[in-house]
Amino acid sequence: QYVLEVGPGTGVLTKYLLEKPTETYVAEIDTESIEYLKLHYQKLENKHFTGDFLKINLNDIFSGEVAIIGNFPYNISSQILFKIIENYQQIPEMVGMFQKEVAERTAAVPRTKDYGILSVLVQAYYDVKYLFTVHENVFNPPPKVKSGVIKLTRNRKEGLEGNEILFKQIVKTGFGQRRKKLSNALKSLDIPEVLKSHAFMDKRAEELSVEDFINFTQEWKAAKN
């Protein structure tokens, strides 16, 4: 029903979104860009927000689900993805352009150098598809890095109910020392005695799938109860 474009600038993408049957809103931190959009796109009347997307409360604005789209600022790429995770119940999908390295990390699979905290946490809530790479020479002035466009489609994994805080803690701690086996990497978390001989303890965080982390979290929680 709703689409929110983050960081529309002068509306290069906005004009195409406004041709669609969905209701398009924009969030832009730059006041001059908002004034430009208001002047050139009448359909955006009362559908624009001046401010930081990271601080916007989506529930205050949208009565239903809202898809997110944007050419996102590279300096807050990870924060935008974490904001989407936090609001997964209201955000069924996202299509966005990020710095290529961030896009690749988000879509990465186990046993690869790009697989890490971002990969696991995003993929616990969304299916991730790397769509295409955007080269520097299509921008003016060209940036120093390539860009990548990814799509997130909500598909929250089973087993997270009531375990989300512990799940995130295990993932972040495990990857905090990614070259160490989990038996060492997770020492600071007071590992339950029954799990100290668990098969996963002999592996590194990068070897575990998203489902492995969720199952391990469930076993950890059960051992503590």
Q: Residue spans of the language-model regions?
A:
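C-terminal lobe and adjacent flexible extensions of AdoMet/dcAdoMet transferase-like proteins
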Residues: 154, 171-225
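Catalytic cores of RNA-modifying enzymes
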Residues: 1-169, 173, 215
